[in-house]
UniProtKB/Swiss-Prot annotation:
PROSITE patterns linked: C2, SMP
GO terms assigned for molecular function: lipid binding; phospholipid binding; protein-membrane adaptor activity
Major localization class: membrane
GO biological process, one term: endoplasmic reticulum membrane organization
Name the UniProt record assigns to this protein: Uncharacterized protein C962.01
Domain SMP-LTD: 266-471
The keyword Repeat is annotated on this UniProt entry: yes
Pfam families for the chain: C2, C2_TCB1
Repeat recorded as keyword: yes
Region feature Disordered, mapped onto this chain: 1-76, 103-130, 899-932, 1280-1303
Topology with respect to the bilayer: Multi-pass membrane protein
Cystine bridges: none
Species assigned in the record: Schizosaccharomyces pombe (strain 972 / ATCC 24843)
InterPro entries: C2_dom (IPR000008), C2_domain_sf (IPR035892), C2C_Tricalbin (IPR037762), SMP_LBD (IPR031468), TCB1-3_C2 (IPR056910), Tricalbin (IPR017147), Tricalbin_domain (IPR052455)
C-alpha cells in the first residue's frame, strides 16, 4: 500500500516548497466517499508522503493538514492560494473527465474504479484541522459582472484529471509516435532476401499495385479467404520494410545536412530565457488570461448587433506552456542608439516536444469557449464557440531605440518578417461526439492565412512596424498618442502638356494631402498653367509611422476635380531623417504624369518623461501642438427635439470652424459617442472647438450646438458642457494637449516681435539646501531659470555642498506674455535625471515697471544691475515644504527694435502688454506714450552703435563634408552652445534652427561655429571656426550669409544663416567686460636672497596657484639661494577681479613635504593689457624676492562644461528634432561663472576643470587657468558674499570712464575697470575692517539648559549664558576679533551633575555680513549674525 501511495502522488507545480496533489480519501475504498477527491497541500518530498499510513489520510499531523471533504455533485476546483476547494457544475466537457478519474492510492484496483458514482450523498465529516492559508481574492470574483457564471479562467482551473492518467496517456502517445525511432535491426524481408528496398516512390507504388492485382485475381478465381489474408500480410510486411527504408533515408539526409557548416551563425538559442518565461507563465497565466478575457469582452461588447444580448467567455486559458523564443539574431549596429534583432517565436500549448517531465504532468492545452446569447424577449438561446489546440509561430523583427534617459529604451518597434502561421481547432458547435472543426472545410485554412496576411500587411508586416513609446508609457501617456507633426511645404508642381492639339487650354490644378483617407489640407487652385506655383505649408498630424502621406494632384478644369496622379512620402524615413527636400514624381497607372517639389520637416511630440525616482518631467509649454478630443455621452437630447429610436444623428466636430471629424449613429440617449480625433493647433490661446448635432433626415440645420474656447477646454480636461439651445442637454468632452515644437520660417521673426527685454539675474548663493544624497555625501546643487516649463539658463554645480556660492550672472529673454520666472535649485546627477531641491518664483512685472521710470539715455548710462539682494525661499513642488533659501539680485532692460518694413503694430502691442498688463490694448496712444521711453524703433546704423544686445541667429542649411555631425554655436567664452542642431543624416541638411544669445560687447565679441560627432557626453570636435560677432552682424543682418568652417582635410563646410540684432540700452558691469578675462603670460626669471630652508641653503622651486589650485610649477634648483629659472607659461584668467593668483616658493625635501619659503599675491588688476610688466615680487618672509615678467592679454577662452550632457537639450525648444532655443553668450544661459568663477566650492569627481583645448601659447608650459572653477576654501573673498562688491553694480549712473563706447581701447577699458571697482567697493578698506559677531536664536534644540561656546583661531573660547531649549534666545555679542574669512568653532553644550555634554560642533567661516544659520548637530542650529564695526 505504501508503494502504491507513492506512485499516485504527482505534484502539479514542481520545484517549489509547497505543491498540490490530488488523492482519494481512504473512506472511498469502503464506498463511503466514492468519487470525491481530497485536495491538500503537501511537501515536495515524496517519501514523507509515501510513508504515511492509509488510515491517517483523514487526519494528518504537522504541517500536512487536510481539509474536510465536501459533498459535490460536480467537479471540485482547488484554489491554490486560499487552500480551499469549490464546487463546479459539470459540463459536457467535464463529465467525461470525471468518469476517467482513478482514485489515488488504489489506482490498480478495479473495485475502486466502480466507486466513482453518485453515492456520495451521506459522506461522514472526518475529524481534522483546517488548512490555514493566506487570504487572497478568488479569481472568479475579479471577473466582470456580465461574464458567464462560473467561468473557467487559467490552466489551473482546467487541470482536474489524475496525474497518473495524464502521464500514462502521453507516454502511450509518445511510444506510438516513436515506435521505430530507434529501430536499427534489419526487417524480415532484409533478413531472408538479398533484395534491398531503397524506399523509392516506384517501389511503394509497385507494392500497392501488386497487392491490388493479386487480390483481384484471388477474388476472381474464388480462392479461399486465407489466400487473400496471405496476400495482405505479405504486402504489409513488404510495405513496412519499404517505409522503414524511407525513414532511414530521411534520417541519413538530415544527419548529412546537419554535418554541414551552418550559415546562420548569427542565430542564438534562448533556452535560459525560455526557462524563466515558463516559470513566469505558470505563475501568472491565470492573471494574464483573466486580463485578456476581460478586455476582449469589453471590446466586443461595443460592436455587438442588437439581436446578440451577451457574449462572454465560459472558459479561457492559453495553456500551461509558455510562448517560446526559438532563436534570436542580432544585427550589426547600423545606426546610433538602435538595436535590431530577428526573433523566431512560437506558441504551441499542445506540443510536448520540448516539455520536461515535471511540466508534462500538469500540462493543460489552450481552450477558449465563447458563449453567445441571442434572441428576443424571453426566447433566449446560447451558442457556444470553442477554440482549442491553438498554434502560432512566426518571425518577428524588433527595433529598440535606446535613450540616455530613463527607462533607457525610447521606442520598441515590432514587425512580422512573414505572415505568421496560425492554426486552431474551431468548433462553432461544441458537441463532444461531433468533430465540427471549421478547418476541415477545404480551402478555409488558406483563406484564413491570406486574410491574416492582408490584415497585417498594412500594420505590422515588414517593412511596416508597430511602434510603442516606452518612455511615454512610463509617464502615463495613453497608447495611440500622435507621434508628431509634419510640416509639408509644397513649392510647385509640373504637369505633362496635353498632346491633343484640339484641346487649346491650360489646366487648373491643386494638390491635396491625406493620410488613411483623411484630408489634412489642400493647396490653392492655380489656373491656366502646366507648372503651378503654390508656396503653401500644410501641417499633418502623424498618428502612425506606417501611414504614408499621400499627395494627390487634381485637375479642376471641369465641373468636378479629376485625379491626375499621386505620390507618397514615407513618414518613417522622415521621422528618422528629420527633413526631406526633394522632387517626387506623380504616377497614374504606373505612368509618370508630373512632379512636385516640396520640403517636409518632422516635428516630434513633446511628451513628459518619468525619472527613476518616480517624478515626472513635464514638457515645455508651447502654443503649438496637437489637440486630442474624445466626445463622450450626450444627455437629454430629447429636450431639444422629438427623437425616436429609429432616428440617426450625425455628430460633427469643428476646430476653428473647420470640420475635422464626424460620426453617424442611431439615437440612444446617454450612450457614448466614442468619437476620437486630433488636430494640429497653431495657437491654443485663440482657438476654439464646436460640436454640432444633425438629424440625418434634415441635415441642413443643427439641432444642437456647443462652442468651447480651447483654453477653457484644456483647463478642465474633462467636463460636461451645455448645448446652447437648451442647458438641460449636455455633452461630455474629454481633451488633452500634446505640445509640439513646430518651427516655421516666420518663427524667428515672431520670436523677435514678442521679445520685449532681458532680465539680468545674479545668482549669488543658496543656504540650507536639502540633502537628497546618501548620508556619506551631500547634494551637488546648481540653479536654473525656468520660463514656461523650459529651462532657459543655469549655473554650474557645486560638488558636495549644501550652502553653495555661485556668483554667476544669467541673462533671460523676457517675452510679451512672461509674467513670472521660476528659479529652481537642482541636484546634479552623473547618471539619470537631476533632482529638484526647491524652487522660487520671481515677478517680472515689478522690474519692468521700474525700468519704465527711466528714459533711453538714462538706461544707457546706468550700470546694468542693482545692489539689492533678495533672499528667496525655496519650496518643494509637492507639498510646498521649505527647502532653503537662494540669494539673487535682478534687473531688467528693454530691447530696441530695428526699423524694418513691417516694424510694426504687433511689436508695439506686445511691448505695451508686457510693460503694463492692466492697460487696455485698444488705448494705443497711451500705450505708445508710456512705452516710447522704454522700447523704440531705431535704424540699423544706430543699432551697431550699441555695444550690448541680443543676437538671434537662424541656421537655414549646410553643405557638409561628412554626415553624422551636428552644429553647435557658442558666444565668447560660453561653456555651452546656444544652438545645437540635430545630427545631420545627409551632407546637405536643412536644419531650420535658431537661438538667441546675449552679446555684451559687440566690439570684442566672438561667435564660434563647431562641428562635433553629436555625442551628448564629451562630444568630439570635428572642426571649428570663430568669427567676430561685429563682422557677422554687419554682413548677415537681415539677409542670408554663409560661414565657412575649414575641415581637417582642408575642405570647407558651408553653413548658411541669417542674424538679427536687438540692442539693449545699458552700461555693462565692468566685471563682465572683455578686458576682465584673458591669458596671463608669466615669465619666471630668478630669485634673490631666498630664505634658508635646510642647512646653509635651499632647493627652491616656485608654484603659481590660481584660486588655490596649482597652475604652474617650476623646476627645482638645488642648493641655491639665488636661483635662475627662465621659465614661462600661459595661464588662462577668467575673471581678474575675483581670481586670486598666488606665488609660493618652496624648499624641496626628498621624501618629505616641501617647506614653504614664502608667499606673495599678484595683483592682476594692476596689469595693463598687452603691456609687459617687470616685477620684483617680495615674499612674506624676512628675505627673498622673485623677479618675473607678466603680460596680460585680454581675450575669450571658452570654459569647459561641468555637466556631461549638452546643456542645449534642456533649454527652450525652438528648432525641430532637438535644436534648442537657448540664451547664450558669456554669462548667459548656462554655467558661465561671470562674477564668481572662482567661488563655486571644491571640485569633486563630477567637476570638469580646465580649458586646455582652447588655449594656445609659447614656452614650455601651456597652462589652463580654468581651474578657477575649483575649491576656494580660504580664498573666498568678500566679493562673493557682499552684493555691492560681487556684482559691482549700483543704481547710480556710471562715471564716464565706465561708459565704454564700442570702439574703446583695451588700455582705457582696463582703467575704467579699475576705477569702477575702486569706486564701488573700496577694496583696500574692505580688507582692514573688523566685525562684530552675535549669537542669536537657537532652533530644534533639546529640552535642556544649553550654552554656546565660540572658539577663534587663537583657541580663545567665549561662552554665552545658559538658556532653556528647544528655541533658546541669546542675542549676545561675542568679544572676538574676527575678520571676513576667519574660522570660528561653534559648539553647543548642556550642563548636568557630572559636567558638560557636547551636543555638536560646527565651523563658521563666512565672507559677508548678515545673519547666518549654522547647523551644529542633527537638526539643531543657531543663528550667527555678523555686523561691521
Amino acid at each position: 500500500m505504501e508503494g502504491e501511495n507513492s506512485k499516485s502522488v504527482h505534484p502539479i507545480l514542481s520545484h517549489s516548497t509547497s505543491v498540490v496533489s490530488e488523492r482519494a480519501s481512504s473512506s472511498g475504498v469502503n464506498g463511503t466517499n466514492g468519487g470525491m477527491k481530497q485536495v491538500s497541500p503537501v511537501s515536495t518530498a515524496r517519501t514523507s508522503i509515501a510513508r504515511r499510513p492509509p488510515s491517517t489520510v483523514g487526519s494528518q499531523t504537522g504541517s500536512l493538514v487536510n481539509a474536510p471533504p465536501k459533498r459535490s455533485s460536480g467537479i471540485e476546483r482547488f484554489d491554490h492560494v486560499t487552500g480551499t476547494a469549490e464546487n463546479r457544475p459539470q459540463t459536457p466537457s467535464t463529465k467525461a473527465s470525471v468518469a476517467n478519474v482513478k482514485p489515488a492510492g488504489a489506482a490498480e484496483s478495479a473495485q475502486n474504479a466502480n466507486l466513482i458514482s453518485s453515492k456520495s450523498e451521506n459522506v461522514p465529516e472526518p475529524a481534522g484541522e483546517k488548512v490555514s492559508m493566506p487570504e487572497k481574492q478568488d479569481l472568479q470574483s475579479a471577473l466582470p459582472s456580465d461574464a458567464v457564471s462560473n467561468a473557467v479562467i487559467g490552466w489551473k482551473s482546467i487541470y482536474h484529471a489524475s496525474d497518473v492518467d495524464v502521464h500514462d496517456h502521453f507516454a502511450n502517445v509518445l511510444s506510438a509516435l516513436q515506435w521505430d525511432s530507434h529501430r536499427v535491426e534489419p526487417s524480415i524481408l532484409e533478413t531472408y532476401s538479398s533484395y534491398k528496398l531503397t524506399g523509392q516512390w516506384w517501389q511503394s507504388t509497385s507494392i500497392l499495385l501488386a497487392v491490388s492485382i493479386l487480390s483481384w485475381i484471388a477474388s476472381k478465381l474464388w480462392f479461399r479467404f486465407f489466400i487473400l489474408f496471405f496476400i495482405i500480410i505479405t504486402g504489409t510486411i513488404v510495405y513496412g520494410s519499404c517505409m522503414i527504408s524511407v525513414r532511414r533515408n530521411i534520417r541519413e539526409e538530415v544527419v548529412q545536412e546537419l554535418s554541414k557548416k551552418n550559415g546562420d551563425v548569427d542565430y542564438e538559442t534562448m533556452s535560459w530565457f525560455n526557462t524563466l518565461l515558463q516559470r513566469f507563465w505558470m505563475l501568472n497565466e491565470p492573471e494574464i488570461s483573466k486580463s485578456v478575457s476581460t478586455s476582449v469582452e469589453q471590446s466586443i461588447a461595443e460592436y455587438l448587433p442588437s439581436f446578440i444580448k451577451e457574449a462572454a467567455f465560459s472558459t479561457f486559458t492559453l495553456g500551461s506552456k509558455a510562448p517560446r523564443i526559438d532563436r534570436v539574431r542580432t544585427h550589426p549596429p547600423v545606426e546610433r542608439d538602435v538595436v535590431l534583432m530577428d526573433v523566431d517565436f512560437s506558441l504551441t500549448p499542445n506540443d510536448n516536444y520540448d516539455v520536461n517531465d515535471s511540466s508534462l504532468k500538469c500540462r493543460v492545452n489552450s481552450l477558449i469557449s465563447l458563449v453567445i446569447k441571442f434572441g428576443f424577449g424571453k426566447y433566449m438561446f446560447s451558442f457556444p464557440i470553442t477554440i482549442k489546440d491553438l498554434r502560432l509561430s512566426g518571425k518577428l523583427r524588433i527595433r529598440w531605440g535606446l535613450s540616455s534617459d530613463y527607462p533607457f529604451i525610447q521606442t520598441a518597434s515590432f514587425s512580422f518578417l512573414e505572415t505568421p502561421i496560425v492554426y486552431a481547432n474551431i468548433r462553432p458547435i461544441d458537441i463532444p461526439f461531433l468533430d465540427a472543426d471549421i478547418f476541415y472545410i477545404p480551402g478555409i485554412g488558406q483563406f484564413v492565412s491570406e486574410q491574416l496576411g492582408l490584415l497585417l500587411n498594412s500594420m505590422v508586416l515588414w517593412p511596416n512596424m508597430f511602434d510603442y513609446d516606452l518612455s511615454a508609457m512610463m509617464a502615463g501617456i495613453a497608447s495611440g498618442t500622435a507621434v508628431g507633426v509634419v510640416g509639408l511645404k509644397i513649392y510647385s508642381a509640373r504637369r505633362g502638356e496635353v498632346s491633343d492639339s484640339s484641346i487649346d487650354r491650360k489646366p487648373s490644378s491643386f494638390i491635396t494631402v491625406t493620410t488613411s483617407g483623411r484630408e489634412h489640407g489642400r493647396t490653392p487652385i492655380r489656373s491656366n498653367t502646366f507648372s503651378p506655383t503654390f508656396d503653401t505649408t500644410i501641417y499633418v498630424v502623424i498618428n502612425s509611422l506606417n501611414d504614408p502621406l499621400k499627395l494627390s494632384l487634381y485637375d479642376n478644369s471641369g465641373k468636378s476635380p479629376i485625379l491626375v496622379g499621386t505620390t507618397y512620402i514615407d513618414p518613417r524615413s522622415l521621422y528618422e531623417r528629420g527633413f526631406i527636400g526633394d522632387i517626387y514624381q506623380f504616377l497614374y497607372n504606373a505612368v509618370n504624369v508630373g512632379s512636385v517639389a516640396f520640403d517636409a520637416t518632422f516635428f516630434p511630440s513633446l511628451l513628459p518623461k518619468k525619472t527613476m525616482d518616480g517624478s515626472k518631467i513635464e514638457p515645455p509649454e508651447s502654443s503649438k501642438g496637437i489637440l486630442n478630443v474624445n466626445l463622450g455621452c450626450v444627455n437629454n437630447l430629447t429636450e431639444l427635439t422629438e427623437l425616436t429610436k429609429k432616428s440617426s444623428l450625425k455628430y460633427v466636430l469643428y476646430v476653428d470652424s473647420k470640420e475635422v471629424a464626424s460620426k453617424t449613429i442611431k439615437f440612444v440617449d446617454r450612450t457614448p459617442i466614442s468619437l476620437q480625433t486630433n488636430a494640429y493647433i497653431e495657437n491654443n490661446k485663440k482657438s476654439s472647438i464646436k460640436v454640432a448635432v444633425f438629424d440625418v433626415k434634415s441635415p441642413e440645420k443643427a439641432i444642437a450646438t456647443v462652442s468651447v474656447p480651447l483654453p477653457e477646454l484644456l483647463h478642465e480636461g474633462y467636463d460636461t458642457f451645455h448645448f446652447v439651445e437648451n442647458p438641460k442637454a449636455t455633452i461630455d468632452i474629454e481633451s488633452f494637449w500634446t505640445p509640439v515644437d513646430v518651427v516655421e520660417e516666420k518663427s524667428a521673426k515672431t520670436y523677435i516681435d514678442n521679445l520685449v527685454g532681458v532680465m539680468r539675474l545674479s545668482v549669488i548663493k543658496a543656504n540650507d539646501l536639502v540633502n537628497v544624497e546618501l548620508p556619506t555625501r551631500k547634494s551637488d546643487p546648481y540653479a536654473r531659470v525656468i520660463v514656461g516649463n523650459s529651462v532657459v539658463a543655469r549655473t554650474v554645480y557645486t560638488p558636495n555642498n549644501l550652502n553653495p556660492i555661485w556668483n554667476e550672472i544669467l541673462y533671460v529673454p523676457i517675452m510679451a506674455d512672461t509674467k513670472t520666472i521660476d528659479l529652481e535649485a537642482m541636484d546634479y546627477e552623473e547618471s539619470g535625471n537631476d533632482r529638484s531641491l526647491g524652487y522660487a518664483s520671481i515677478n517680472v512685472q515689478k522690474y519692468i515697471r521700474n525700468a519704465k521710470r527711466l528714459d533711453r539715455s538714462a538706461l544707457a548710462s546706468t550700470v546694468f544691475g542693482t545692489s539689492e539682494v533678495n533672499a528667496l525661499t525655496l519650496t518643494s513642488r509637492k507639498g510646498q515644504s521649505v527647502r532653503g533659501t537662494i540669494s539673487v539680485n535682478c534687473d531688467y532692460r528693454p530691447c530696441l527694435r530695428l526699423n524694418t518694413d513691417n516694424s510694426s503694430k504687433q511689436s508695439s502691442e506686445n511691448v505695451q502688454s508686457a510693460t503694463d498688463p492692466t492697460t487696455p490694448a485698444k488705448d494705443n496712444s497711451t500705450s505708445n506714450a508710456e512705452t516710447s521711453s522704454i522700447t523704440s524703433v531705431i535704424s540699423v546704423n544706430e543699432a551697431l552703435q550699441y555695444p550690448s544686445g541680443f543676437a538671434l541667429i537662424s541656421i537655414v542649411s549646410a553643405d557638409l563634408q561628412d554626415v553624422g555631425v551636428d552644429l553647435r554655436v557658442f558666444t565668447d567664452n560660453a561653456a555651452f552652445p546656444f544652438i545645437t542642431t540635430p545630427i545631420a543624416k545627409t551632407k546637405t541638411p536643412r536644419w531650420s534652427s535658431f537661438g538667441i544669445s546675449m552679446v555684451r560687447e559687440l566690439q570684442f565679441s566672438e561667435t564660434t561655429f563647431q562641428l562635433t560627432d553629436g555625442a551628448k557626453k564629451d562630444p568630439k570636435v570635428v572642426c571649428e571656426h570663430s568669427v567676430k560677432t561685429l563682422d557677422l552682424v554687419s554682413e548677415a543682418l537681415g539677409r542670408p550669409y554663409s560661414v565657412e568652417i575649414p575641415g581637417s582635410n582642408g575642405q570647407l563646410n558651408h553653413v548658411r544663416l541669417s542674424i538679427t540684432y536687438m540692442p539693449v540700452p545699458m552700461t555693462l558691469n565692468p566685471m563682465e567686460s572683455y578686458i576682465n578675462s584673458g591669458s596671463l603670460h608669466f615669465m619666471l626669471q630668478d630669485g634673490q636672497n631666498l630664505p634658508i630652508g635646510d642647512i646653509r641653503s635651499s632647493d627652491p622651486f616656485v608654484v603659481l596657484k590660481l584660486n588655490g589650485e596649482s597652475a604652474f610649477k617650476s623646476k627645482v634648483i638645488k642648493k641655491n639661494l639665488n636661483p635662475v629659472w627662465n621659465e614661462e607659461a600661459d595661464i588662462v584668467v577668467q575673471n581678474r577681479v575675483l581670481d586670486v593668483l598666488e606665488l609660493v616658493c618652496y624648499d624641496w625635501d626628498m621624501g618629505e613635504k616641501p617647506d614653504v619659503l614664502g608667499t606673495s599675491n599678484i595683483d592682476l588688476l594692476s596689469l595693463e593689457p598687452n603691456v609687459e610688466s617687470q616685477q620684483s615680487i617680495k615674499l612674506d618672509s624676512k628675505t627673498g624676492t622673485i623677479n618675473a615678467s607678466l603680460r596680460f592679454v585680454p581675450g575669450w577662452h571658452r570654459r569647459k562644461a561641468v555637466l556631461d550632457v549638452t546643456l542645449a537639450d534642456n533649454f527652450l525648444h525652438a528648432a525641430n528634432k532637438g535644436a534648442k532655443l537657448v540664451v547664450g553668450g558669456v554669462g548667459a544661459a548656462g554655467g558661465l561663472a561671470l562674477a564668481g568663477v572662482t567661488t563655486i566650492g571644491s571640485v569633486g569627481s563630477k567637476a570638469v576643470t580646465g580649458v586646455a583645448d582652447g588655449v594656445t601659447g609659447t614656452g614650455k608650459h601651456i597652462i589652463s587657468g580654468a581651474k578657477g572653477i575649483s575649491k576656494m576654501g580660504m580664498f573666498r573673498r568678500s566679493l562673493e558674499k557682499n552684493p555691492s562688491r560681487s556684482d559691482l553694480t549700483t543704481t547710480q549712473e556710471a562715471s564716464s570712464s565706465a561708459s565704454v563706447p564700442p570702439a574703446i581701447a583695451p588700455e582705457s577699458a582696463n582703467a575704467a575697470l579699475t576705477s569702477t571697482i575702486d569706486k564701488t567697493t573700496g577694496a583696500p578698506e574692505l580688507a582692514q575692517k573688523k566685525y562684530k559677531v552675535y549669537v542669536g536664536q537657537g532652533k530644534n534644540m533639546p529640552h535642556k539648559t544649553i550654552k554656546i561656546i565660540v572658539t577663534d583661531n587663537q583657541d580663545h573660547s567665549f561662552k554665552t549664558k545658559s538658556r532653556k531649549g528647544p528655541s533658546p534666545s541669546w542675542n549676545e555679542e561675542i568679544p572676538v576679533k574676527w575678520s571676513l574669512g576667519d574660522e570660528l568653532r561653534i559648539s553647543a553644550v548642556t550642563s548636568n551633575l557630572l559636567g558638560h555634554t557636547k551636543l555638536g560642533e560646527a565651523v563658521f567661516q563666512e565672507d559677508a555680513i548678515g545673519t547666518f544659520r549654522v547647523v551644529i548637530g542633527g537638526s539643531s542650529s543657531v543663528e550667527i549674525k555678523v555686523e561691521a564695526e
